[in-house]
Amino acid sequence: MSSEMCTVCGLPKELCICEEVAKEQQRIVVKIHKRRYGKEVTVIQGIDPHEIDLQDLCTYLKSKLACGGTVKDGVIELQGNHIGRIKDLLSKKGFSASQISL
């Protein structure tokens, strides 16, 4: 085992549960915004960028939903209307389904 210890929980890095606890405490809001020419964008907000790597989460969602997307100002934007599948995908990544509002 490595001698590195987590500064938050005091456990070794391999056993650290800080990120899982942070995921369960997030209050996530998913909305659909209309853009130019009637294009729809799924916007995911409420995830703390200091505790969760938004770029990795965005890459995961883009690959599962087969769409384009980006991270802007702590908000994940995905091209298209994906509100039907987003709750299930976020739950699989460890976020609490009861904390996700559509």
Swiss-Prot record:
Any Pfam family the entry gives: SUI1
Keyword flag Nucleus: no
Keyword Protein biosynthesis assigned: yes
InterPro entries: DENR/SUI1_TIF, SUI1, SUI1_arc, SUI1_arc_bac, SUI1_dom_sf
A GO term, aspect molecular function: translation initiation factor activity
Any Gene Ontology biological process: translation reinitiation
UniProt keywords, alphabetically: Protein biosynthesis, Translation regulation
Family the entry assigns: Belongs to the SUI1 family.
Protein name: Protein translation factor SUI1 homolog
Protein's organism: Methanothrix thermoacetophila (strain DSM 6194 / JCM 14653 / NBRC 101360 / PT) (Methanosaeta thermophila)
